[in-house]
């Protein structure tokens, strides 16, 4: 609907230019927002205030001329001036109802992508292997997954890339420790304790540390025995990750793994190509790139280190190889990097070097989708009581146990297997939603009591809201698709719910553009609240007429489909009853 209004305004502006009211050459970004006060319209634009100065007119006077020049459209009943020069638009209620009827009949709930479909790389999760995933890996994994799901739903070809840290010193440590302490495969499956013991030896023994580094050199040189051990450690570690992904209901598989090791053979080519481009400069024995746009507080250029003084490569080298692969081989139009926002400078530099070096051969937009940190209830980094890192599996297990206690208290007569099944959906959903509902760039404090609350913007509230809709259709023994009739909007609660449901496509396109799933969370919470008001004020099964009942059932069906689809795009499972 906003696009329709923008087009109407653009046509009016073109007419005013032709009439000499507006000067030629104006290219304003026409903004249309949802009106806050529905008594003054459904949408509002500040275009008259934006163009008043170049037009040499008062905003309200220009607004009058814009309204007079607006073409007639069946979707808009009228336009009015408000305040200092806002133009408020009232949408045609019947046209709105017809759009919702069409959305209910559509497999994509009437949602379409605002622009052309693209090939989009989503770089997400990317844990360092050789140890278990911890809470610090949660945000990249689930925010990236949510945005990837939305992009796919809108029609993009999404290529997930799990850029795991599967190369480096940690594997030398493990190999050196295994040489000292041969163990069985079963014992090795407890990788966390094995890694902890190896790290302790590495920190305490210089001789052990030297041996570990020597094994890394042998590994990088292709030593068969080292490669075999590395493969074993890597496979065990990836299997741990895969269990977490499946528990989190995240769409990542082994086929999506493209770790640091995958780019090893291209690193020397990256160095040689930068050298050939005249971009490499030696600084303190290291090979670096200096770019004028990146300087320190003293105004000196900051180095992007490509090769260390000891000949080793860094993250920047591998990331440059990855950029070239994603552009040249994958032919991506867009690459989204879901990595901690503390890496912002790193990615700014990598992207700039890649463009200058000509590594982006296929036009590819690169965006660092940085995010804040998850903290404990005290606002400090989330740790165990003894100050250690919290393992992700432990956090998710506790979430399920807490949800189980909550569900059992509310439903003491349910069978235990059903309680466990519901608790898994509620517990995992609560952890994910608590994260996804926060702005991506914000830090937030992890709080089990808040996220498992049945009131407020939480997963349990939304899951329960969906079961209320599902319950209506369960009573009727009908599917959402089996409701005949047409939507007719009479009561204010019907109109408010309908107007919100019509915004689903706009919200999803916003998530796809900005990588901000919290806007989808807010939208679903608002839909649930409006459905609650509608459900209380507009009886469905005891409606006054059969036609009214069918209309309200259709509104409920579209609400159910929207909530279910929205939660699925966030990676949350739904329940038919709680």
Curated annotation (Swiss-Prot):
SMART domains in the record: Arg_tRNA_synt_N (SM01016), DALR_1 (SM00836)
Reaction(s) the record says it catalyses: tRNA(Arg) + L-arginine + ATP = L-arginyl-tRNA(Arg) + AMP + diphosphate
InterPro entries: aa-tRNA-synth_I_CS, Arg-tRNA-ligase, Arg-tRNA-synth_N, Arg-tRNA-synth_N_sf, ArgRS_core, DALR_anticod-bd, Rossmann-like_a/b/a_fold, tRNAsynth_Ia_anticodon-bd
Motif 'HIGH' region, residue range(s) on this chain: 127-137
A Pfam family reported for this protein in Swiss-Prot or TrEMBL: Arg_tRNA_synt_N
A GO-annotated cellular component: cytoplasm
Domain of life: Bacteria
A GO molecular-function annotation: ATP binding
Principal subcellular localization: cytoplasm
UniProt KW rRNA-binding keyword: no
Biological process per Gene Ontology, one example term: arginyl-tRNA aminoacylation
Entry's localization field: Cytoplasm
E.C. designation(s): 6.1.1.19
SUPFAM superfamilies for this protein: Anticodon-binding domain of a subclass of class I aminoacyl-tRNA synthetases (SSF47323), Arginyl-tRNA synthetase (ArgRS), N-terminal 'additional' domain (SSF55190), Nucleotidylyl transferase (SSF52374)
UniProt keyword annotations, A-Z: Aminoacyl-tRNA synthetase, ATP-binding, Cytoplasm, Ligase, Nucleotide-binding, Protein biosynthesis
Family membership noted in the UniProt record: Belongs to the class-I aminoacyl-tRNA synthetase family.
Assembly and interaction partners: Monomer.
Name of protein: Arginine--tRNA ligase
Name of the gene encoding the protein in the UniProt record: argS
């Amino acid at each position: 609907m906003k696009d329709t209004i923008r087009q109407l305004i653009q046509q009016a502006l073109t007419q005013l230019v032709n009439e000499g009211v507006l000067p030629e050459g104006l290219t304003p970004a026409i903004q249309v927002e949802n009106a806050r006060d529905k008594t003054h319209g459904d949408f509002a634009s500040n275009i008259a205030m934006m163009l008043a100065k170049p037009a040499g007119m008062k905003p309200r006077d220009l607004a009058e001329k814009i309204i007079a020049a607006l073409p007639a459209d069946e979707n808009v009943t009228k336009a009015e001036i408000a305040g200092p020069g806002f133009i408020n638009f009232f949408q045609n209620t019947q046209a709105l109802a017809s759009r919702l009827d069409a959305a209910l009949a559509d497999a994509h709930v009437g949602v379409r992508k605002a622009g052309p479909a693209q090939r989009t790389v989503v770089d997400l999760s990317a844990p360092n292997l050789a140890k278990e995933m911890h809470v610090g890996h949660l945000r990249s994994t689930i925010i990236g997954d949510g945005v990837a799901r939305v992009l796919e739903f809108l029609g993009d070809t999404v290529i997930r890339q799990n850029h795991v840290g599967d190369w480096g010193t940690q594997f030398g440590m493990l190999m050196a420790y295994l040489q000292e302490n041969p163990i069985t495969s079963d014992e090795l499956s407890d990788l966390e304790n094995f890694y902890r013991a190896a790290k302790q030896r590495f920190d305490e023994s210089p001789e052990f540390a030297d041996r570990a580094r020597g094994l890394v050199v042998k590994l990088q040189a292709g030593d068969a025995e080292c490669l075999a051990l590395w493969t074993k450690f890597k496979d065990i570690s990836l299997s741990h990750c895969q269990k977490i992904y499946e528990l989190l209901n995240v769409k990542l598989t082994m086929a999506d793994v493209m770790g640091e090791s995958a780019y090893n053979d291209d690193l020397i080519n990256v160095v040689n190509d930068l050298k050939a481009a005249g971009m490499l400069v030696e600084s303190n024995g290291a090979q670096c790139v200096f770019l004028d746009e990146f300087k320190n507080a003293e105004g000196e250029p900051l180095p992007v280190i490509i090769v260390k003084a000891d000949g080793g490569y860094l993250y920047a080298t591998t990331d440059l190889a990855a950029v070239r692969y994603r552009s040249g081989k994958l032919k991506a139009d867009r690459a989204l990097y879901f990595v901690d926002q503390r890496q912002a400078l790193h990615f700014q530099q990598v992207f700039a070097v890649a463009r200058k070096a000509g590594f982006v051969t296929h036009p590819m937009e690169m965006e660092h989708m940085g995010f804040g940190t998850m903290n404990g209830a005290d606002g400090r980094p989330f740790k165990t009581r003894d100050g250690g890192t919290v393992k992700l599996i432990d956090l998710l297990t506790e979430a399920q146990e807490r949800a189980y206690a909550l569900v059992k208290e509310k439903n003491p007569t349910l069978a235990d297997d059903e309680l466990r099944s519901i608790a898994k959906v509620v517990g995992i959903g609560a952890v994910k939603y608590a994260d996804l509902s926060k702005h991506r760039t914000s830090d937030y404090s992890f709080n089990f009591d808040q996220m498992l609350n049945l009131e407020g913007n939480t997963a349990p509230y939304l899951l329960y809201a969906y079961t209320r809709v599902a319950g209506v259709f369960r009573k009727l023994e009908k599917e959402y698709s089996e409701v005949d009739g047409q939507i007719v909007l009479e009561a204010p609660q019907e109109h408010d719910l309908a107007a919100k449901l019509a915004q689903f496509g706009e919200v999803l396109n916003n998530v796809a553009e900005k990588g901000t799933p919290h806007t989808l969370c807010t939208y679903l919470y608002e839909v649930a609240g409006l459905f609650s008001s509608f459900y209380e004020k507009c009886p469905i099964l005891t409606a006054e007429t059969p036609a009214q009942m069918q209309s309200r059932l259709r509104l409920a069906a579209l609400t159910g489909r929207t909530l279910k689809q929205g939660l699925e795009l966030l990676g949350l499972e739904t329940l038919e009853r709680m």
